[in-house]
């Protein structure tokens, strides 16, 4: 018989600042340290990322958009055609961190501005 047992943790962080941006502005990344992603998660678990659809200032009520219970979330990877310069964001992970990578054929500048100040929800599944 097969027995499934797992633990799920959710971590929410605010995105601010890039750790690396290429000179031509077509690639960049952010490293976010998440100690809950341990060796067991890397070996046999999973990590998913979701970016908040709203941030402070998106509504007339400036506080709206910070309540994670009412928030809408977009699953990563995410391709946005909304901007003049379409960009792609994807999530990778390793022991103790996630890396959010941005790519565009033209420029990631608009996507950096879009994500700045937004929340990133990380869902970590540890198999036991």
Which residues does each PLM region occupy?
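Short, ordered beta-strand-loop transition motifs
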Residues: 23-27, 90-97
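A generic structural signal for short, non-catalytic loop/turn and secondary-structure boundary residues
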Residues: 4-6, 42, 82, 93, ...
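C-terminal partner/receptor-binding element of secreted or periplasmic proteins
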Residues: 94-128
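Mature extracytoplasmic domains of secretory-pathway proteins
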Residues: 33-91
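A structural detector for beta-sheet-dominated domains
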Residues: 14-16, 50-52, 92, 101-103, ...
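Extracellular receptor-binding modules and their adjoining Ser/Thr/Gly/Asp/Asn-rich linkers
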Residues: 2-48
